[in-house]
């Protein structure tokens, strides 16, 4: 069965009232009103005004939050019903009522008929969501009007338009029903009288030919007023809350003429609740409070007036939200639901003198009406007209079976004690949620309405929240003044509880508020902060993005979620263009190579932006910052230490205050440099260094006799042998002093002991030994011929020199017991050599590896080789490595055997010679390299991004390094540069390509030699032929 949602409003057309104003006496109920107890009724629902033209008193509206008033009109309802005393006479008069066909002509005496119909018309704006209504009207008014094709009767039996057809059998009326009909007729007559007095109101936008009313064939219950129908007015302020109608709550109808907007809150109607109708043409803005109707609650009426002199606590300035009622129709089969525009929200409110009559009508018809109520306000996506500022809630009327069940409960008083939870699961959920909502509103107000709390309430309901709510067709009422067509928005009614978080609750375009919901605090979800993503990275949806959307909207993945525009600024086209730019920049960066020129050797920087910056030039700021650093200062002792008195020496040199150890080191250094005499003259007598020099000289036997003859004159010594002594004086010839005092001879013999220590193999003819001659400072005249040959041709003969030195060291130092192979390596750029030790099958072995790039002279090879052989001996013979005690023992043994060797040290201090120098043209930074492997045009400085030039380092005749600009590659380098790309393949390594290039270069170089040889041979043959001819 299809579910339809209607929005009820006053369908009485005041323009069609053709009766002249009549002076009828004011009718009111003679019975005394009685107050309802406060326990079952939260608020007093209504009371009639003492006079229809008097000021309206403040009353609480006992209406459903989701229902508007049924419009009631009848031509014959203005009869005086209150004075009828005889109930039987009235019953007989009412029983004679006949159903008039629609096409029948209007008779002189109109017959009264009650019609419950559902009429709709197309909206003015042409929207699909149009307003609907349930109308109770007089068929005598519309007898001359044709039926629109889109009309639908709510009754299960269709109206017979044939005048010759038999009339509908008249139902038997009981006394109770007669009383109820009497009350109905009285209220209708009062309302008609007031409309006649006040004149016609603003006509509706629909023509009379398009309006219709149809009879609803229903088993109408008795409509007799009781003492509870009229209640005294109340002036208590009405608050917005939830209204719960219990199982036996009777119909509450509010009829009003000038109330413009009725503010009603959410209401949960039970399955057993009877139909609640609300009829109004222009409702005053009022608030309806929470009301719990008990099982035996009588019909409540409300009579209100539009006069401004009444004492009211109603907030007239508050915007009133709209409501909609969901009515599943079961009467007519095959008929479409007609649509009718609502004029209740747009009728003119300028008629301030119009009075309002509110009466209570108990209508019990067999209308199957279901209730589908989301727990909170459902999202009104159909509110494409922006006049509404908040979402509307949907409610429905009870079904006809429920009305019959209510009649049965009224007859059986024991059924009132039936539990509320005895109905189906949907009813249990609604009752549970209503009570929970009521309690939470009392405790927390509106602050508890969050998605988590709503979801928890649903899960805690009787059915566990498993039943899906009905999805009615939301029909929207459009004002008369609405002429602009709005684009319909997607249906968001399925959002249910989350609608208040996804819809803007207020707009400033119109003060009208047709949702009939209380003004609430606007809840907005802020946009998620957008994080900046890399432009080259494509956007990927989150793995739980779809699930998050479904939590909010089960049908649409884009309307309800605020995640849809989280990355609105991210554009694929922009990312593509940016990625293209990045690729171009990468290609440009790939062509350039950045070099770090702050080190001695050039270092290639792959990415200068990401790598740590190289150390820059020294700046004055560094010194200032260094001076500002916190430093730990030595604390002064509490009691100063007493120091011995030291005699101050004025005008004494800085030297002379060394201790014994320092004196020994100074003297040993001077002894190696043959500077003992200079050292003795620099230090004063009595100093530790001077004393140490004297001790060394005494041990070496240097200057022992020279100390006794410093005062003798060398001239006398030279003249004594020349003078011939007389013949008689022979003994003086044998005098010892001339022989003893020979200071020049003694001074000439001083360097002899040092030569014997420094040069163990004394060179013949005054030349230096082999090891000493390998040094570049030794001249060619004093150098050994073989050593000089190796020194001058070291690059070509370094292997032979290494083998020669190895044999010499092994024989003198290691007794020919050391067997160590010697290799050369191009990978060692800073290390002069290394000894690689191995152990295999409990046998130790070593391999000495020498650097080609560091060992560029013969003297470096001499010192490095003995250093590494000492490591090998310590490992092979003693099983120890490193520069420990064993290594130092072997180094001292080598120094003792070869005095010409310098002191064997742990580390070298060789300045590495590079073949090329790279220099920046911008910042003048320079660094060195052993080879050139990149084009100079593609090189840039890492510090200043400036261009780099290349220099070639060469030595002149004096041995000084001269840097000259490097020219173009020549020979094999140029051949490789020109042909490397031609021979390169994907499956070949660079070494394989170089082998091919070497073969090709050798072939190319050998062709001219063969050509020259062939030409020479041809010439020789030609000469021989000439000789033979001669």
From Swiss-Prot:
GO molecular function terms listed in the Swiss-Prot or TrEMBL record: DNA topoisomerase binding; MCM complex binding
GO CC field: chromosome; cytoplasm; nucleus
Record's compositionally biased regions (Basic and acidic residues): 20-33, 541-553, 578-594
Cell compartments where the protein resides: Cytoplasm; Chromosome
Knocked-out gene: effects: Homozygous mutant females initially laid eggs but stopped after approximately one week. Many of the embryos derived from these eggs exhibited maternal-effect lethality. The few adults from F1 progeny of homozygous mutant females appear sickly and sub-fertile. Of these, 4% display bilateral gynandromorphism a rare phenotype caused by X chromosome loss during the early embryogenesis. By contrast, embryos from homozygous mutant females displayed X chromosome bridges and second chromosome missegregation and polyploidy.
Composition skew (Polar residues), residue ranges: 298-316, 329-349, 505-516
Region (Disordered): 1-59, 196-245, 266-361, 375-433, 457-594, 699-764
InterPro entries, per the entry: SprT-like_domain, SprT_Zn_ribbon
GO biological process per UniProt: protein-DNA covalent cross-linking repair
Keyword annotations from UniProtKB, A to Z: Chromosome, Cytoplasm
Biased composition (Low complexity): 720-748
UniProt record similarity statement: Belongs to the serine-aspartate repeat-containing protein (SDr) family.
Chain's role: May play a role in DNA-protein cross-links (DPCs) clearance, ensuring the genomic stability by protecting germ cells and early embryos from various sources of damage. Limits replication stress and DNA double-strand breaks.
Protein name: Germ cell nuclear acidic protein
Gene coding for it: Gcna
């Amino acid at each position: 069965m299809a579910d339809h949602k209607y929005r009820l409003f006053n369908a009485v057309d005041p323009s069609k009232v053709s009766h002249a104003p009549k002076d009828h006496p004011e009718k009111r109920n003679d019975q005394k009103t009685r107050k309802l107890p406060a326990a079952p009724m939260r608020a007093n629902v209504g009371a009639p005004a003492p006079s229809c033209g008097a000021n309206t008193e403040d009353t609480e509206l006992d209406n459903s939050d989701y229902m508007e008033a049924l419009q009631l009109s009848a031509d014959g309802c203005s009869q005086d019903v209150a004075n009828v005393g005889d109930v039987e006479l009235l019953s007989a008069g009412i029983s004679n009522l006949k159903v008039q066909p629609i096409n029948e002509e209007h008779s002189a005496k109109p017959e009264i008929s009650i019609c419950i119909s559902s009429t709709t018309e197309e909206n003015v704006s042409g929207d699909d969501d149009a307003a609907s209504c349930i109308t109770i009207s007089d068929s005598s008014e519309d007898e001359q009007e044709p039926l629109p094709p889109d009309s639908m009767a709510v009754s299960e039996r269709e109206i017979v338009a044939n005048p010759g057809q038999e009339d509908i059998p008249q139902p038997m009326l009981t006394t109770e029903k007669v009383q109820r009909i009497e009350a109905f007729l009285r209220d209708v007559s009062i309302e008609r009288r007031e409309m006649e007095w006040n004149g016609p109101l603003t006509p509706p936008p629909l023509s009379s030919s398009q309006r219709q009313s149809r009879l609803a064939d229903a088993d109408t219950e008795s409509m007799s007023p009781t003492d509870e129908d009229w209640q005294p007015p109340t002036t208590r302020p009405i608050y917005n809350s939830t209204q719960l109608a219990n199982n036996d709550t009777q119909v509450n109808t509010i009829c009003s003429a000038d109330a413009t907007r009725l503010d009603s809150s959410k209401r949960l109607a039970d399955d057993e609740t009877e139909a609640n109708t609300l009829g109004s043409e222009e409702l005053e803005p009022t608030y309806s409070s929470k009301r719990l109707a008990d099982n035996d609650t009588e019909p409540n009426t409300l009579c209100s007036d539009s006069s401004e002199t009444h004492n009211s606590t109603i907030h007239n300035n508050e915007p009133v939200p709209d409501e909609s009622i969901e009515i599943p129709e079961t009467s007519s089969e095959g008929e479409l639901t007609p649509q009718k525009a609502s004029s209740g929200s747009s009728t003119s409110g300028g008629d301030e003198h119009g009075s309002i009559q509110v009466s209570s009508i108990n209508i019990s018809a067999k209308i199957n009406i279901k209730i589908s109520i989301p727990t909170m306000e459902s999202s009104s996506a159909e509110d494409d007209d922006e006049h509404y500022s908040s979402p509307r809630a949907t409610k429905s009327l009870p079904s006809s079976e429920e009305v019959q069940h209510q009649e049965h409960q009224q007859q059986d008083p024991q059924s009132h004690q039936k539990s509320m939870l005895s109905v189906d699961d949907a009813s249990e959920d609604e009752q549970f949620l209503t009570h929970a909502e009521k309690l939470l509103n009392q405790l927390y107000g509106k602050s508890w309405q969050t998605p988590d709390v709503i979801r928890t309430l649903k899960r805690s309901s009787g059915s566990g929240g498993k039943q899906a709510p009905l999805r009615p067709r939301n029909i929207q009422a459009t004002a008369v003044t609405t002429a602009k067509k709005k684009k319909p928005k997607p249906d968001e009614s399925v959002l249910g509880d989350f609608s208040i978080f996804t819809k803007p609750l207020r707009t400033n375009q119109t003060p009208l508020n047709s949702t009939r919901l209380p003004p609430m605090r606007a809840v907005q979800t802020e946009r998620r902060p957008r994080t900046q993503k890399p432009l080259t990275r494509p956007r990927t949806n989150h793995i739980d993005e779809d699930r998050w959307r479904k939590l909010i909207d089960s049908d649409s993945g884009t309307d309800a979620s605020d995640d849809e525009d989280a990355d609105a600024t991210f554009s694929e086209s922009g990312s593509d263009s940016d990625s293209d730019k990045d690729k171009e920049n990468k290609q440009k960066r790939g062509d350039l190579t950045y070099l770090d020129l702050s080190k001695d050797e050039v270092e290639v920087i792959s990415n200068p932006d990401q790598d740590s910056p190289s150390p820059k030039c020294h700046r004055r700021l560094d010194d200032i910052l260094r001076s500002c650093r916190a430093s730990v200062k030595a604390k002064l002792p509490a009691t100063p230490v007493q120091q011995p008195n030291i005699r101050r020496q004025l005008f004494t040199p800085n030297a002379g205050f060394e201790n014994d150890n320092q004196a020994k080191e100074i003297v040993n250094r001077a002894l190696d440099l043959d500077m003992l005499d200079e050292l003795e003259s620099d230090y004063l007598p009595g100093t530790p260094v001077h004393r140490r020099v004297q001790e060394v000289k005494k041990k070496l036997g240097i200057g022992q006799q020279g100390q006794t003859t410093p005062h003798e004159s060398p001239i006398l010594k030279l003249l004594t042998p020349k003078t011939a002594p007389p013949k008689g004086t022979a003994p003086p010839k044998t005098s010892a002093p001339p022989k003893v005092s020979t200071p020049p001879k003694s001074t000439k013999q001083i360097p002899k002991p040092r030569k014997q220590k420094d040069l163990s193999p004394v060179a013949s003819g005054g030349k230096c030994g082999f090891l000493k001659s390998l040094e570049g400072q030794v001249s060619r005249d004093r150098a050994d011929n073989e050593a000089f040959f190796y020194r001058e041709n070291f690059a070509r003969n370094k292997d032979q020199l290494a083998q020669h030195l190895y044999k010499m060291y092994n024989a003198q130092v290691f007794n020919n017991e050391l067997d160590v192979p010697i290799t050369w390596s191009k990978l060692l750029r800073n290390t002069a050599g290394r000894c690689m030790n191995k152990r295999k099958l409990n046998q130790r072995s070593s391999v000495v590896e020498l650097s080609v790039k560091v060992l560029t002279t013969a003297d470096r090879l001499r010192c490095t080789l003995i250093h590494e052989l000492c490591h090998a001996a310590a490992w092979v013979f003693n099983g120890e490595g490193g520069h420990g005690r064993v290594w130092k023992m072997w180094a001292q043994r080598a120094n003792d055997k070869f005095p010409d060797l310098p002191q064997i040290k742990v580390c070298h201090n060789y300045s590495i010679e590079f073949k090329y120098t790279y220099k920046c043209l911008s910042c003048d930074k320079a660094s060195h390299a052993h080879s050139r492997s990149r084009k100079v045009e593609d090189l840039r400085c890492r510090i200043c991004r400036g261009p780099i030039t290349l220099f070639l380092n060469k030595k002149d005749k004096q041995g000084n390094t001269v840097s000259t600009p490097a020219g173009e590659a020549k020979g094999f380098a140029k051949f490789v540069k020109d042909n490397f790309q031609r021979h390169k393949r994907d499956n070949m390594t660079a070494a394989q390509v170089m082998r091919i290039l070497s073969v090709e270069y050798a072939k190319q170089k050998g062709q001219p030699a063969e050509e020259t040889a062939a030409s020479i041979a041809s010439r020789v043959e030609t000469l021989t032929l000439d000789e033979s001819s001669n």
